[in-house]
Structures are given as C-alpha cells and as structure tokens.
C-alpha cells in the first residue's frame, strides 16, 4: 500500500497476533486493525497491491530455535480485518527475509528445526495456495534483509 504502513505479529512481553496500521500522509500513532491467525514472531512480510502477507515465524515463546511455522497469512488493505491462513511455505522457518514482485511474494532463507535454510519460496498473490521452491540462495542464511527492484 502507498497509503499506509502495516506491522504484524512480534513480541513485547509475550507473543502477539496484532496487525497495526499507520498512515503515511501524516505523523500519527498506529491502530490495531486486526489479528493474524496465531500469536507469532520473527515473521516475514510481503505486499501485493491489495493485501499484506505474513509468512513463517515461530510460535514458541522462548524463541530458542523451536516452534518454527510454515504459515502464510493474508489480510486486506481495503478494509480493517483479521488475516486468513492461505497456504504454507515449503519449509517451516523464521528469521527469513521477504520480497514482493507485482505478482508473487517470496520468503528467502531463514532458520528452522533443521538449521539454516537457503530456500527461495514463492507464492502467488492472485490465488491462495502453498508456496513452491523457486530456487536457492547462494548461501544458507538467516537474520538478513530483503529488497526488491
């Protein structure tokens, strides 16, 4: 969205499922506009022109490399609403990076129960479905950033 920023999930004194929204046009506090399908943190974000996505993460409160998730949650930009689970990543993981093209979301790298991952997962914005393995990073990594051009 070019109108608002969104943030979802995370941790404060516990795990959160909150979807927050704030305007780009003026300096203002965020408001709670919905919930993810689970309390989760260390997720990855992607955006289409109409929806926000949260993928992967961990649902384990100690965050000690357990409880990795394969969830792909989707929520609308047009109306304040809860997210729906629309698919799964090929590998459950967290500390991944997120990228978005005009037609697909990507979740890259990360850490899961099997250790570091190099997988590039791709999921369609036009239909709700599981991600597919679109390739591999040059090295397995986690706690990295994602960009698109």
Q: Which sequence ranges carry the predicted segments?
A:
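Polar, enzyme-active/binding microenvironments
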Residues: 1-149
């Amino acid at each position: 969205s070019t109108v608002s920023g969104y943030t979802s999930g995370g941790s404060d004194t516990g795990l959160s499922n909150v979807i927050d929204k704030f305007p780009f046009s003026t300096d203002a506090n965020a408001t709670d506009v919905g919930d993810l399908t689970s309390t989760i943190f260390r997720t990855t974000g992607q955006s289409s022109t109409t929806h926000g996505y949260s993928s992967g993460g961990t649902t384990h409160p100690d965050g000690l490399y357990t409880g990795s998730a394969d969830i792909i949650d989707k929520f609308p930009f047009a109306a304040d609403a809860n997210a729906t689970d629309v698919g799964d990543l090929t590998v459950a993981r967290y500390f991944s990076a997120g990228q978005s093209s005009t037609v697909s979301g990507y979740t890259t790298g990360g850490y899961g129960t099997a250790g570091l991952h190099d997988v590039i997962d791709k999921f369609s914005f036009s239909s709700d479905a599981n991600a597919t393995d679109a390739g591999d990073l040059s090295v397995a990594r986690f706690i990295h950033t994602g960009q698109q051009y």
